[in-house]
A protein has these predicted regions:
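N-terminal glycine-rich FAD/FM-binding segment characteristic of electron-transfer flavoproteins
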Residues: 1-339
Length: 339
């Protein structure tokens, strides 16, 4: 009762990285609240799944194993969470802001009339004062996310209804194993008690999984371009520099919206979150929405003609100049010195 729950997204028999990241965060939240961390795994052929999950500090793993639970379809997974939560009454539920999470989260929160905050960039525990009614709420989940196009950061709380639900994008939270030998309880549930046969009305006939075009999230060096790159041709220069540095190329939302780069390269609150050892920002002003996706980089270098650009305030090094001037010089230098 009143524990922290994480819904585990599973591809085949492998737990998704975003779910493991949320287990890490969930463990920290549970420690602050003095409660347990529980996880829910629903799929097929899940024997031994606990080996992937318990090391993240999970006190109880709820397993639902049945042929109709993979590939994912909406109704069975919704019934599992709704009926389980009616029994267990969690205070917090976290899930990935993925295609599945964006489908499942609203269904569950609507069924439980609990509300949900999508695409959170931070999750914290705190106090909320309702000055109008003179009520103070302790130990609420602060669901923090950029709002109004990334121009402000909003802190959202849910004082009355439970569970407090939030989705988080992959890469926003850090994935850290707590203890390889962590001892947690594994509960294998009778799926039929939670899911009516009518929920299996949708059958997945075939699946086509598109391979990733790049490894932006895992790259040690990321070169990102903004609207200041001016054109697709400007981005070609970044790809040329990336080739010399064995880096990946990312983009700000403004650059993607302008058609300079593909959407799958977008870094920020509505794109990918990256934590490279080196991040080179070229022609990026540094709106809150973008900074949320790269602020944990080891070293940040900003190439910008505006000395007052917001991104310069978090950069370790600032090169004050136009990208048309600076980027070709970087390419020339590394071509000369990498041989």
């Amino acid at each position: 009762m009143n524990n922290v729950f994480v819904y585990l997204e599973i591809e085949g028999t492998t737990v998704a990285d975003v779910s493991l990241e949320l287990l890490t965060k969930g463990r920290k939240l549970a420690n602050q609240l003095g409660c347990q961390l529980e996880a829910v795994a629903a799929g097929n052929n899940l024997a031994g799944i606990e080996k992937q999950v318990l090391p993240y500090g999970v006190d109880k793993l709820h397993v639902f194993d049945a042929p109709g639970l993979f590939p994912y379809t909406s109704l069975p997974h919704t019934s599992i969470l709704v009926n389980l939560f009616k029994e267990e009454k969690p205070q917090i539920c976290l899930m990935g802001a993925t295609v599945i999470g964006r489908d499942l989260g609203p269904r569950v929160s609507s069924a439980l009339t609990s509300g949900l905050t999508a695409d959170c960039t931070q999750l914290e525990i705190g106090t909320h004062e309702d000055k109008k009614n003179g009520i103070t709420y302790e130990n609420l989940l602060y669901q923090i996310r950029p709002a109004f196009g990334g121009n402000i950061v909003a802190t959202i709380v849910n004082p009355e209804h439970r569970p407090q639900m939030a989705t988080v994008r992959e890469g926003v939270m850090k994935k850290e194993i707590l203890d390889e030998n962590y001892k947690g309880e594994v509960v294998n549930h009778d799926v039929a008690k939670f899911v009516p046969e009518t929920d299996y009305v949708v059958k997945v006939i075939d699946r086509h999984v598109e391979k990733a075009k790049h490894n932006l999230k895992g790259a040690p060096i990321v070169i990102a371009g903004g609207y200041g790159m001016g054109s697709k041709e400007g981005f070609d220069k970044l790809f040329e520099l990336a080739k010399e540095l064995h880096a990946e190329v990312g983009a700000s939302r403004a650059a993607v919206d302008a058609g300079y780069a593909d959407h799958d390269r977008q870094i920020g609150q509505t794109g990918v979150t990256v934590r490279p050892k080196l991040y080179i920002a070229c022609g990026i002003s540094g709106q809150i929405q973008h900074i949320a996706g790269m602020q944990d980089a080891g070293i940040i270098i900003s190439v910008n003609s505006d000395p007052n650009a917001p991104i310069n305030t978090i950069a370790d090094y600032v090169i004050n100049g136009t990208v048309e001037e600076v980027v070709p010089k970087l390419i020339k230098y590394y071509k000369k010195n990498s041989k």
